[in-house]
Design a protein with these regions (language model features):
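Catalytic and substrate-binding clefts that recognize carbohydrates or anionic sugar/phosphate headgroups
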Residues: 2, 8-11, 19-247, 257-258, ...
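Generic recognition of flexible, low-complexity loop/linker segments
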Residues: 6, 167-170, 177-179, 240-242, ...
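Beta-sheet entry/capping signal
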Residues: 6, 16-18, 180-181, 187-190, ...
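An acidic- and aromatic-residue-enriched active-site/binding cleft used to recognize and process polar
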Residues: 14, 22-24, 53, 60-62, ...
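Aromatic- and carboxylate-enriched substrate-binding clefts and catalytic-loop regions
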Residues: 24, 80, 84, 94, ...
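A conserved hydrophobic secondary-structure block that centers on an alpha-helix together
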Residues: 171-172, 246, 256-306
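Catalytic core of carbohydrate-active enzymes
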Residues: 430-435, 439-440, 447-458, 468-471, ...
Length: 687
């Protein structure tokens, strides 16, 4: 039997068209944890007019925004061999009045052999449980974004499963941070407003279409178009929220490992960094500050940290902030377990689940904190508040990609909560941190749409290897193309091989990853074994030199960060953000802009050589002052270990800090000076 549904088309003033269709009980709403409309957004009325075989939707200024084709296709009917195709929905959108974004109305071989449908629902067990939406794809079209994707820059041909899960590294299809948003080389992007598990095929299943399949019988898509990639990303932030500005101290060096075990050990390390003039702002305590390692109870071990408040105050006087690891699960042996179960602060399990005993899985814990339940959220905030009141300045909101799926949550089914959980978790930690300390910040691993409002995020458990470094950079680039401004990664990778915990990191990997970290929005050393530079004596002086460079660059980083939180820019910028028309840039994932002025090409091999692509423009080698014409490749460039290819736009003005400091507390940013990259510039380290 024929079924009829209402397709809603809304137009917003900044080049955004919205399509909504609910197959059943779903209704269009702007009330969502994922949405946070900016003041720039307003709905504009649409008028409808029949023009020939099309219904045209246009705004008051006469700009066409959509065309619905109802004209019968021209036929020369000579054969009845095959049946006519089904009726289809042939709509072309013009979000900014310029770009044509057409639904994939005719993606089939012959009836009934359909590769895709423009809009459809899918039935399982007799119910409408899934929905699909498809847009046309062009043969030369490229795609990027979708979260922290550890793939090459151009995602065309990929079919992605948008389900948050522990990535277990940065060299596979799994990822901690899925974002239901992509960018196209045709200068548009699409945000699918859902937290359901979904599949996104970017001309993968069918080379003729971009197909979105949601495990929810509802479609709510915002199509954003513009003249620049940054404009499209800003439109996405106008829908889902802008990043907040991290505090000054967060842009300094963070030092960590898995893990420090006592106050004495931490004090010794911090004192040595000051004595040997390694600038550093944050010391992070990972899994070893509890009564039992990994047993997260949000309380210090009384024997190893006998006076935590005094310990934190001593570090603060010496210019260090303290960051603490924890997670959103409660262990069976935790002292809070009875309270958490009795009050259903953790979601009750419907059946017992097996554990793998690794401490790296939600299944190893008794339950997941239910952030859909306001009382549970306030209880969790209270656990953090007692730590923040002691002087802790940042909470590492680790995990959050996985939840107990066989559990009953107060406000949402687990199938919908799985992806959204990261947002609710990080929001709670961010809010209480800002309330107590005045600084809005977390150190987070998982993400979904909207999480960019609560910086910052890091890239998860990379391997301390060249492929781990390359995978991290790829993930960071796609993450920046998904609406996030701030991102970091474990320097020099999290785990080692072949022994996960105990293999030694190679000196060149440590050094090259340090250079990469210096030119990232935030730099943190972390991993399964020792990360302090004096454990790598052959390169320790070089590491110190690069750390000092980092602190010199903080005024520039602050300047670019202020720009980022008011626009669509990330700090780590794929080349396509500046050169979307340059086809080469859609295939370069080992270079990036750092802010709008630096071009960075990390070395990721032991041969100390790499090819470097200079985009159009005039470039100056930051370290030597050499001037180079862009629009070309530099082949087989030899780069000594103490150097990294970094170029600056000619005539750029880079604010730098002229004095050496131990930490950002010693900085007075009004003392910053302007480094002019003009004809007089001879190089940063050139005497």
């Amino acid at each position: 039997p024929r079924e009829e549904y209402t397709l809603i088309i809304r137009q917003y003033n900044i080049g955004i068209t919205r399509l909504f269709l609910g197959f059943g009980e779903y209704e269009l709403t702007d009330q969502s944890e994922m949405l946070q409309f900016s003041e720039r957004i307003r709905r504009v009325p649409l008028s409808v007019e029949k023009q020939g075989g099309k219904w045209i939707l246009f705004t008051q200024d006469g700009t066409k925004r959509a065309a619905i084709n109802v004209e019968e296709p021209a036929l020369d009917r000579w054969s009845e061999l095959l049946p006519d195709p089904q009726e289809t929905l042939d709509i072309t959108l013009y979000p900014d009045g310029k770009r044509e974004i057409r639904l994939a109305a005719y993606d089939h071989f012959s009836p009934p052999r359909y590769d895709g449908l423009p809009i459809a629902f899918c039935k399982r067990t007799g119910k409408k449980e899934r929905a699909t939406l498809s847009f046309e794809s062009r043969p030369d079209e490229c795609f990027a974004g979708t979260g922290e994707r550890f793939f090459k820059m151009d995602l065309s041909g990929q079919t992605l499963f948008l389900k948050n899960q522990d990535g277990q590294g940065v060299n596979n299809r799994r990822t901690y941070k899925n974002i239901p948003f992509y960018l196209s080389s045709r200068m548009y992007g699409t945000f699918y407003h859902t937290c359901a598990h979904s599949k996104l095929s970017l001309a993968g299943h069918s080379t003729r279409s971009v197909q979105f399949l949601s495990d929810q019988a509802m479609l709510d898509a915002f199509v954003i178009a513009g003249d620049a990639m940054e404009e499209i990303l800003r439109g996405y932030r106008d829908l889902t929220g802008y990043p907040s500005m991290p505090p000054l101290w967060s842009f300094g060096v963070w030092m960590s490992r898995m893990t420090y075990f006592s106050a004495d050990e931490v004090n010794e390390i911090c004192d040595r960094m000051r004595a040997e003039h390694y600038p550093c702002d944050v010391i992070h305590l990972d899994t070893g500050w509890f009564r039992t390692d990994w047993l997260c109870e949000w309380k210090f071990n009384e024997e190893r940290f006998p006076d935590p408040k005094g310990f934190i105050q001593r570090l603060k006087k010496n210019g260090y902030r303290v960051s603490l690891w924890q997670l959103p699960y409660v262990a069976e042996d935790a002292e809070q377990i009875e309270e958490a179960k009795a009050n259903e602060y953790i979601a009750p399990l419907t059946k017992q689940q097996d554990t793998d005993g690794s401490n790296f899985s939600a299944l190893d814990y008794a339950g997941t904190i239910d952030f859909t339940y306001p009382k549970a959220t306030e209880w969790y905030k209270g656990l953090l508040k007692q730590l923040l009141d002691m002087g802790v300045t940042c909470i590492k909101t680790d995990f959050g990609e996985n939840i107990h799926m066989d559990a009953v949550y107060k406000g949402m089914k687990p199938e919908l909560l799985n992806n959204l959980y990261a947002l609710l978790y990080q929001k709670a930690a961010y809010e209480i941190t800002k309330e107590v300390t005045g600084d809005g910040i977390v150190w987070a691993r998982a993400a979904w749409a909207g999480c960019q409002r609560y910086p910052l995020h890091w890239g998860g458990d990379s391997c301390s290897s060249w492929d781990g470094m390359a995978g991290s950079l790829k993930g960071g680039l796609h993450f920046g193309l998904s609406g996030f401004a701030f991102w970091s990664h474990d320097v020099p990778g999290f785990h080692t091989l072949p022994n996960f915990m105990n293999s030694i990191v190679a000196d060149d990997v440590y050094m090259r990853w340090t250079q990469f970290g210096v030119f990232t929005s935030h730099i943190r050393y972390h991993g399964t074994n020792k990360r302090e530079p004096w454990h790598y004596p052959a390169i320790a002086p070089l590491v110190k030199k690069w750390w000092k460079l980092r602190y010199s660059l903080i005024p520039y980083i602050i300047e670019q960060s202020k720009l980022a939180v008011e626009s669509g820019w990330p700090l780590l910028q794929a080349l396509i953000l500046h050169h979307p028309e340059d086809k080469l840039c859609w295939h370069i994932d080992d270079e990036y802009y750092f802010g709008n002025d630096f071009l960075v090409a990390p070395v990721m091999n032991s041969e100390n050589r790499r090819d470097i692509y200079l985009p159009e423009g005039q470039w100056v080698n930051f370290f030597t002052g050499e001037r180079l014409q862009g629009g070309r490749w530099l082949k087989e460039v030899y780069v000594p270990l103490e150097e990294m290819p970094v170029y600056v736009r000619e005539n750029a003005v880079i604010p730098i800090y002229p004095e050496e400091v131990n930490c950002t507390d010693e900085m007075d940013l009004s003392k910053s000076i302007a480094l002019r990259i003009d004809h007089n510039y001879k190089g940063f380290w050139t005497k």
